[in-house]
């Protein structure tokens, strides 16, 4: 679907990092932003995982903020909803989590840590064309992509799933991929 993006540590701050030639250090996060194609249709899924198998306390805190934002967006997905509403939901959920961590006091500053939109179309292209000003319709497929980037902590991460709009909500097509701190740490401990 596209060249895989694999980045460790602060290289995650380069959203489409294309030079995976650096050594990854103990304690760093590794971003895996990958896709697959079938009959010319593509996917786009991202996860981060700790190089040493365990999230640090700060990494886990930020990961949970992004996870909660990702899930808040999924709860809003249904026919008739507009993409800008989902982007707003992601920013609002991220703000609440970042505020609780003492990183933000004013919603106007959210772009300091949330650098990209929360949704984009997938299909014939990774960032497929589609009307962002048109409401969602049943059987549309797009990403839910919550990302948080805190340079002063040296932590950047995103959780990106592919979802299918259903009559009453959405189906997470990438639900089988571990996505919570606990699921990822468990997987890392067994491999």
Give residue spans per PLM region.
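Active-site neighborhoods and metal-handling regions in enzymes and metal-associated proteins
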Residues: 1-191
């Amino acid at each position: 679907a596209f060249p895989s993006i694999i980045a460790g540590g602060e290289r995650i701050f380069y959203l489409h990092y294309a030079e995976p030639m650096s050594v990854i250090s103990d304690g760093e996060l590794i971003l895996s932003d990958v896709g697959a194609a079938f009959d010319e249709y593509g996917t786009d899924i991202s996860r981060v995982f700790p190089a040493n198998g365990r999230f640090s306390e700060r990494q886990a805190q930020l990961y949970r903020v992004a996870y909660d934002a990702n899930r808040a967006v999924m709860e809003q997905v249904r026919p008739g909803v507009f993409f800008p509403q989902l982007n707003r939901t992601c920013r609002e959920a991220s703000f609440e989590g970042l505020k609780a961590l003492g990183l933000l006091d004013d919603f106007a500053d959210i772009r300091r840590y949330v650098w990209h939109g929360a949704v984009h179309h997938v299909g014939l292209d990774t960032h497929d064309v589609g009307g962002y000003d048109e409401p969602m319709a049943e059987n549309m497929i797009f990403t839910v992509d919550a990302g948080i980037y805190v340079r002063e902590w040296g932590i950047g991460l995103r959780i990106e799933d592919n979802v299918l709009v259903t009559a009453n909500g959405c189906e997470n097509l990438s639900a089988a991929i571990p996505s919570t701190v606990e699921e990822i740490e468990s997987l890392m401990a067994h491999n």
